[in-house]
Amino acid sequence: MSNAIVRGSFRQRVEEKIVQIGNLLWLFFIVLMLQPVISRRMLEYARAQALRNLERSRGSRAIALVHRQETMNLLGFPILRYINVEDSEEILRAIKLTDPQTPIDLIVHSPGGLVLAAMQIAHALANRKAPVTVFVPHFAMSGGTLIALSASHIVMDENAVLGPVDPQIGEYPAASILRVLERKSHDEIDDRTLILADVAEKAIRQLALGVTALLSKRLPGEKAQRLAELLATGHFTHDYPLTVEELRRLDIPVSTEMPEEVTLFMRLFPQPKQLTPSVSYLPTLPGRRA
């Protein structure tokens, strides 16, 4: 009788342990599933705090347009991001909700994107009564440059770059498509290329006029037109980096007094995690000892 009781008690304890282990496994999987969400929320909170710090230090409305390749934590797939209509809608709403007399600080870190979206943002910024400052901590290419040109002030890191704003038709630069017409007779060119050339001609003309209008708000008309033709008509390759020194040679006023708050904000957009990091360093800030 006593042996049966002992065996029953032992079996009960084993079953309780199995249930406890099962509960722990379920808890582990729940935490594993929630971890990316919690990490994302904490990162978003830190970014919001960094923007508030910039607003307090400069008495402005801070907006960020950052397109960093990010990785989904759960599956590890890279997400490539560009300027799109969703970005323009959000920024237009932010501008609309900002008092007309309040300065706007826009942080731009982008490889470019849709001309429509970038031009909408640029026009909205150019029409502001209060000063607009665009901060470029690393690069603002193509559509990002278009947005930067609309600002009252451009502030760049000493090593940051802008880029040309010449339109792209599919996978080809519009200016390069037009040069085919100059080097071949129409009899040697297929219909598709002729159609692309027609679209390319219109795209270059439209973008050059748009850039001229933006630059005319801060530069003399003749100089604005000259710069627009240089940047929008294929004088450079589309990925050509325009450094601070070169922009100043082109008479585009650029400052390099980058606020520390912007640098700290960009640290909250780390590179996608890899098995072996491609860049390693000990983070230090100007004025602080390592």
Language-model region placement:
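Glycine-rich, charge-decorated loop segments at or immediately adjacent to ligand/cofactor-binding or catalytic sites
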Residues: 140-151
